[in-house]
């Protein structure tokens, strides 16, 4: 996909030089100084609050390891709405540092689904921008630059522990019923020890020095004050032994160098904030405002997953949902404007959205309500657009020979009230074109029709068809049908349900459906206009009356068991 090519790397914001006053919070400098400071490293307290001022810049940063989940789509939407409401920028960044799971196909699928949904990004893949590139896999040189700066400042040190040593630390911690945190084996190593391991070619990681006591607090725009005890966090890795940076380090560097002002993301990322805040402090960057959105839950209040049905945007698109309905519904999962209104366009959401009205409690995903909402949006479309969407669907499905025209317009008008999803239109038209007369007459619901003398109505209806009287009336459209039905009722001395229920069964083969007059006129026109594919299961008027003529009414007697021949043609 040419439009998804990497953006040029126009500009990268470099970190300022770290000041001694900041770095005194960490062990740094030469060995003797480091030993002295480390011995006094007992307590650390910082209140992490975002820098004020500047333009609003938010980002959505999906990992291309699968499809765009509705939870991710909602996060993207909230970021977009906040940016537009504040006159800011919405940035899309691809976090593809998981080399084993990230694929180009997944990235393209995510971008395609997000484009279909509607929130347009201002910077990112396919668009570019001055803070690119916008794929983490293309920013490795930047991560290494910052890792080296942290190493030089003493905020990071080389750790030569093997996997076996790390596993042993975990086992000991487990036996002592302690958190499985790194013990700091290489945190206070001498320069001679480090040089010796480097000379031997021992693999190493970069570990970030974490104060052993104290706490860290942030002001979350949704959850309020959130705090962590630092003694629960050991020195953590920011760069693996293969030179690949770790997620939390990449995210912090990217958000800082892309001038992200607000980080709006799912609450499952809240634990990552502790590590990221420490890295921000070490690099001397002002922190963004954080807002952690609650998870989307299944009806049983568990985390929404594949076992609950469709969960990705692409699945809902393929099922026949409209993007505007998805946007409307996702916005209401955890947000509301304080009124009873449930229907919003994307433009209206931009006008109404505030982060203060986002709830901290989990939102239940109700697929039934989503389907209902989609039907409301579908039926509110301008008739030209609705005809185009459904007409194309019918043609692509091999039911209609054309995607537009009088037949399409009339069929959409007749059937739209029973269509909630675009895909429902196929079943609706196929059902309309079918003629399950025998099945209906043989059903329990068909018994009252038989008892009401439907066979006598059938004889008169056949006579009207054979004479050309019915066809002539239907050729005139709805007015012709109404005039004919009125006269037909007088002839049989029937009216209302007594007239139209047997007519519905005899003409459509069904007990229920849309207006019988409009249905009959449409079926007649379908047979004369060539608008329906012959192989689409359409039973023409000639075929219907042929079937009707062959019905053995005595076989449907309520006092006699039905024979096999009575329910088959």
Curated annotation (Swiss-Prot):
InterPro entries: aa-tRNA-synth_I_codon-bd_sub2 (IPR020751), aa-tRNA-synth_I_CS (IPR001412), aa_tRNA-synth_I_cd-bd_sf (IPR008925), Glu-tRNA-ligase_bac/mito (IPR004527), Glu/Gln-tRNA-synth (IPR000924), Glu/Gln-tRNA-synth_Ib_cat-dom (IPR020058), GluQ/Sye (IPR049940), GluRS_core (IPR033910). Its EC number is 6.1.1.17. A motif ('HIGH' region) lies at residues 62-72. Catalyzes the attachment of glutamate to tRNA(Glu) in a two-step reaction: glutamate is first activated by ATP to form Glu-AMP and then transferred to the acceptor end of tRNA(Glu). ATP binds at residues 69, 268, 303-307. One of its GO terms (cellular component) is mitochondrion. Keywords: Aminoacyl-tRNA synthetase, ATP-binding, Chloroplast, Ligase, Mitochondrion, Nucleotide-binding, Plastid, Protein biosynthesis, RNA-binding, Transit peptide. Its main location: plastid. This is Glutamate--tRNA ligase, chloroplastic/mitochondrial. One of its GO terms (molecular function) is zinc ion binding. It catalyses: tRNA(Glu) + L-glutamate + ATP = L-glutamyl-tRNA(Glu) + AMP + diphosphate. One of its GO terms (biological process) is reproductive structure development. It comes from the Eukaryota. The keyword Coiled coil does not apply. It is found in: Plastid, Chloroplast; Mitochondrion. A motif ('KMSKS' region) lies at residues 303-307. Belongs to the class-I aminoacyl-tRNA synthetase family. Glutamate--tRNA ligase type 1 subfamily. L-glutamate binds at residues 59-61, 95, 247-251, 265.
């Amino acid at each position: 996909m040419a439009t998804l090519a990497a953006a040029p790397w126009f500009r990268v914001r470099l970190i300022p030089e770290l000041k001694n006053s900041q770095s005194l919070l960490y062990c740094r400098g030469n060995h003797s100084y480091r030993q002295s400071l480390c011995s006094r490293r007992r307590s650390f307290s910082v209140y992490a609050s975002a820098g004020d001022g500047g333009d609003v810049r938010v980002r959505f940063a999906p990992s291309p390891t699968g499809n765009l989940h509705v939870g991710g789509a909602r996060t993207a939407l909230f970021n977009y709405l906040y940016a537009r409401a504040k006159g800011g920028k919405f940035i899309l960044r691809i976090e593809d540092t998981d080399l084993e799971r990230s694929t180009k196909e997944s990235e393209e699928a995510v971008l395609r689904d997000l484009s279909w949904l509607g929130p347009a990004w201002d910077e990112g893949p396919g668009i570019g921008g001055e803070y690119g590139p916008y794929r983490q896999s293309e920013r490795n040189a930047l991560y290494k630059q910052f890792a080296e700066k942290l190493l030089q400042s003493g905020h990071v040190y080389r750790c030569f522990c093997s996997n076996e040593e790390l596993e042993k630390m975990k086992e000991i911690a487990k036996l002592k019923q302690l958190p499985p945190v790194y013990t700091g084996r290489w945190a206070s190593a001498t320069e001679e020890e480090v040089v010796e391991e480097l000379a031997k070619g021992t693999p190493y990681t970069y570990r970030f020095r974490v104060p052993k006591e104290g706490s860290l607090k942030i002001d979350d725009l949704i959850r309020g004050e959130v705090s962590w005890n630092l003694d629960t966090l050991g020195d953590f890795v920011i760069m693996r032994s293969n030179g690949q940076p770790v997620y939390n380090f990449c995210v912090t560097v990217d958000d800082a160098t892309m001038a992200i002002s607000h980080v709006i993301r799912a609450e499952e990322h809240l634990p990552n904030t502790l590590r990221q805040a420490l890295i921000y402090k070490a690099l001397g960057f002002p922190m963004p405002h954080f807002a952690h959105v609650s998870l989307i839950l299944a009806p049983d209040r568990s985390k929404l997953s594949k076992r609950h049905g469709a969960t990705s945007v692409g699945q809902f698109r393929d099922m026949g949902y409209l993007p505007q309905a998805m946007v409307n519904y996702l916005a209401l999962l955890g947000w509301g404007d304080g009124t009873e209104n449930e229907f919003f366009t994307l433009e209206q959401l931009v006008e109404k959205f505030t982060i203060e009205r986002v709830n901290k409690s989990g939102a239940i995903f109700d697929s039934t309500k989503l389907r209902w909402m989609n039907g409301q949006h579908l039926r509110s479309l301008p008739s030209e657009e609705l005809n185009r969407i459904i007409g194309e669907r019918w043609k692509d499905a091999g039911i209609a020979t054309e995607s537009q025209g009088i037949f399409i317009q009339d069929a959409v008008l007749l059937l739209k009230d029973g269509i909630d999803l675009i895909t429902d239109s196929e079943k609706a038209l196929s059902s309309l074109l079918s003629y399950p007369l025998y099945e209906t007459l043989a059903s329990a619901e068909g018994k009252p029709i038989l008892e009401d003398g439907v066979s006598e109505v059938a004889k008169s209806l056949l006579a009207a068809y054979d004479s050309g009287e019915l066809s002539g009336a239907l050729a005139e459209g709805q007015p012709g049908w109404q005039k004919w039905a009125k006269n037909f009722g007088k002839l049989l001395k029937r009216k209302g349900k007594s007239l139209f229920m047997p007519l519905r069964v005899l003409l459509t083969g069904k007990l229920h459906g849309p207006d019988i007059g409009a249905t009959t006129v449409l079926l007649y026109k379908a047979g004369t206009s060539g608008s329906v594919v012959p192989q689409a299961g359409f039973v023409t008027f000639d075929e219907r009356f042929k079937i009707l003529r062959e019905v053995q009414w005595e076989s449907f007697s309520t006092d006699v068991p039905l024979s096999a021949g009575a329910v088959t043609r």
